[in-house]
Amino acid sequence: KRQEVNAAVIREVMAGVTAHTHDTPIVLITNPLDVNVHIAATEFDYPQNLIVGTGTSLDSARLRRHIADQAHVSPNSVQAFMLGEHGATAFPYLSHATIGGMTLAEASATLGFEPLDPNQVSEAVVQSAFDVLHGKGWTSSGISRAAVSLAQAILRDDHSIHPVSAVADGCLLYTSPSPRD
């Protein structure tokens, strides 16, 4: 039911947007994110390259925090991404994660923390979202920060890398099937 309501809202908002512009970047944050990005990018006469969702930006921030806590460093020193669909099915891309330019294996040996198990890391990242939800009753702050960061990157054209949801050549990126399949 919630998915249908959110899809209807996306359709209503996109109809309003397309009545006035076709050249403004659009950042979506509404769950189910990948489905709503697909709706916005394929059901309206709007450039697909201007429509993105926050993707796994929030999950990736939680991953960086988890790695930083294990290594006893600042999250700003960690480069790491969660990939896949936002939420419980996202997975950590640890083979390319770094701390201060070191691989996780190098950082583990240098900084003296235990090697990270991908399954445990994934569970910890997902659990951290539930901890926030149960502690505050909502998770609006984190996703708001992720959306603002993405919007600033777009507005400033700063060439930063963000794990977004987007449609390319009619295919939904990451692991989500097309809602029409």
Language model regions located:
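Rossmann-like NAD(P)(H) cofactor-binding subdomain of soluble oxidoreductases
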Residues: R2-R64
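Active-site catalytic microenvironments for nucleophilic, acid-base chemistry
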Residues: G16, E43, L150-A153, S178
